[in-house]
Amino acid sequence: MNQKRFLLSSVSIAVLTLIGQSQAMAQATATDTPAQAVTQEIQQVVVTGTAMARGTRKIDTAFSITTATEEQLKMASPSSTADILKLVPGVYAESTGGQSGANVEVRGFPSGSDSPFVSVQLNGNPIYPVPVLSFFEGTSAFRLDDTIERVEVLRGGPSTIYSVGQPGATMNFILKKGEDTPERTIRLTGGTGDLRRVDVFLGGKLADGWYGTVGGFARQTHGVRDPQFLADDGKQITGTLTRKLDGGEITVYARLTDDKNAFYTGVPLISSNNGRTISSFPGFDPLTGTLMSNELRHFTIDAAPGKTLERDLADGRGMKAGVVGADYEQKIGGWDVSNKANYFKGDLNTISMFTGNNPVTAAAYLAAANASYNPLANAASGSMTYVRGGAVDPNQQVVQAGLWSVEKELRSFTDELRISKEIVPNHTLTVGGYYANYKSNDEWYLGNSHLMTATPNASLINVTLTNGTIVARNGVDGNVFAAPVAAYKGHNTALFLADEWKISEQLRVDAGARREKQTIEASIANQVTGDTDNNPLTVYNNGTTYATNTYTSLSRDDSVNSFTLGGIYKLAKDASVFVRANTGHTFISFDDLRNAGTQAAVNDRNGVPTPKVTQYEVGYKTAGQFYSAYVNAFFTKFTGIAFQQITTNAVLNSVSGSRGHGVEFELAVRPITNLQVTLSGDWQNSEYRDNPAIAGNDVQRQPKLQFRLTPSYRIPLGDTALGATDLKLYGTYTHIGERWADQANLSYLPSYKTFDIGALATLGSNWEVRVSATNLTNELGLTEGNSRLTGAQSSGPINARPIFGRAVEASLLYRF
């Protein structure tokens, strides 16, 4: 960490000298003209999924890839890193949990939660090489700010043979690098939830052949759902240093992030019409409400006999981490050589509320408690009082929610080397290797149920029965049911080979293969159950699960082969068709070792299989002055994926596969000057296979149809005292189709739609004002049912997670 601080300090000092430079240098304009934007789209080069570091023109790639510039990212007003994926066809991101902890589904791949089929990269290297662990998914390790030039999101394609070998989506963020023309900006943002944010970026030339940047953000907000404390509170700094070489360059970069983010799960709602109709729960605004409150914020975990832990909900699903890396590319004697390496270390903890049973009246809760604990001493009734004092009305709706603590310390080192050469005319061969070493130290406490009012910013409730049984004390009415403490480590090595054959000026074919081996190990504390206070009448902590000082060691080795074959035929200079087939794999993870429990179970490849995916796609690409189109059809076949569902009191596991097909599209028309209308989205149909219990059911959480329609219009306003001024107006209509919240297809999630709007005023070359609003009409849409309950949840009071209500932001940017 000291090395990273030294690097950032060095870069910062160097770049800050740019501020004092006295020479007059041209400033970049705030936004490109429509003609410039079209030219940039046609000529845009992508580096994700390409064999050589210098990349390939997007329209000439034989795979499906979505790109977004800095301006396109700002127009999208993403609420989190995962929310950026709403721009990507074939991907559905449930980003309603806040900054972290998203569920992301890709192309009908069967995933129950988190984001196992999305890898997040920075400058082409994975931030953490394992895309998902329990209570960690890749987007949680990244925060967007003004140091990012663009993002590229590759779906399928040749990604199965490069980098981590991700068969799903690869999300690659490209950092800005210093250029001859300096860029110096400061941006102030305010908005809903008392948002206060400042972004700063400085970049430019330091000396002959040397370039640097430094930037970052600081931000505080109570959020759209105000928990009565800061929902997001953090800061980040990023620096780069680039050295130009003969025929190439090397860039080193470092990023430090310290961010606390509240994590949102379900809220009380009313379901009717077999789950087709969702309405507000009495007294609870589903768009802005949360059960979290100052009363719940600081809580205690009865972890083991004689052991209690103090936790703070304000810590949420945040991150305190750093990444340092190097990106080298150079042409040496006819050989193209590139190497990307990074080291990541950080704490990505989850101190959060997870909703449990659906709301009931206080009287119904008390009756159930009497029935459950009657054998202890013939309980006949009892009392329910608020922790802060006062009796609870028997008709008061109450709900249970677990206050969980999951601490994860992650470390990793990754490196990828590629060497390319045209070995014979029109044949370019690429050979390379990939290495990753990674660790995770975990300490979990799941359960810890609390009884509270089903109201915004809930109040805690105590329950005591007439026989002396204490059902809930300080709101705690449930024990810790899972407490794994474990140290994990693993490493992957891979070799890959790719060949590109230019058959003619119109036809190009490529093929590649990858051989990869993974070794993972775990040392997991054995668990026992007991009464933490030796008092049978304090039933809330009876049967508490806790770790012992004895450990079980588990390990597994796996080797897989992956392939890709594709081709592209140019119909014209800026139009082409392509085909692609690939076979890829995802390895089992640390969690699979823990869930298996014994070495014999780990060794059972039927019970703990190595997932395999086969994909086929065919597509068409074109771009021009008046229109652009990127359209592809795909087919996927998935086998052998293990599922885990953490309920209110247990962990459920199963193994399944799936098949799916669909169409993805990104279309744009520019019928007149300054007007553009884009339409992007996908239609897909995916079903479970291989598991008789759910075979034929729709893959959970994924809409059959989703799309975004975005018109934008630029209005030149002429010269003003500040210089050339224009106004851009834009908006987005989003449709998300119906889905099932569970594998059994019993919990229905209705379709929903949202409207977003925005305006950007460019005032000369120095000033920029932007105003945006998301979910303008306060649509009530669900992204998740109660994932900690099984079975039908179709009528009456339920817990589910809606999208955020209307949020408005305004920002002022100054270039200096």
Segments (PLM) and residue ranges:
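Extracytoplasmic beta-strand/coil segments of soluble accessory domains associated
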Residues: D32-P34, T50, A82-P126
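N-terminal periplasmic accessory domains that precede
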Residues: T81-I84, N103-E105, Q121, G138-A141, ...
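Short acidic/polar hinge/loop motifs at secondary-structure boundaries
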Residues: P126-R155
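Transmembrane beta-barrel wall of Gram-negative outer-membrane proteins
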Residues: E183-T185, G190-N294, G316-K331, R514
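Acidic/polar loop-and-plug regions of large Gram-negative outer-membrane beta-barrel proteins
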Residues: T242-K244, E249-V323, I351-S405, A458-Y488, ...
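Membrane-embedded beta-barrel scaffold of Gram-negative outer-membrane proteins
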Residues: D336-N342, K570, S576-T586, G607-V663, ...
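Gram-negative outer-membrane beta-barrel transporters
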Residues: S628, A633-F638, A642, N653-Q743, ...
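C-terminal beta-signal and adjacent terminal beta-strands/loops
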Residues: T734-D742, A759-F816
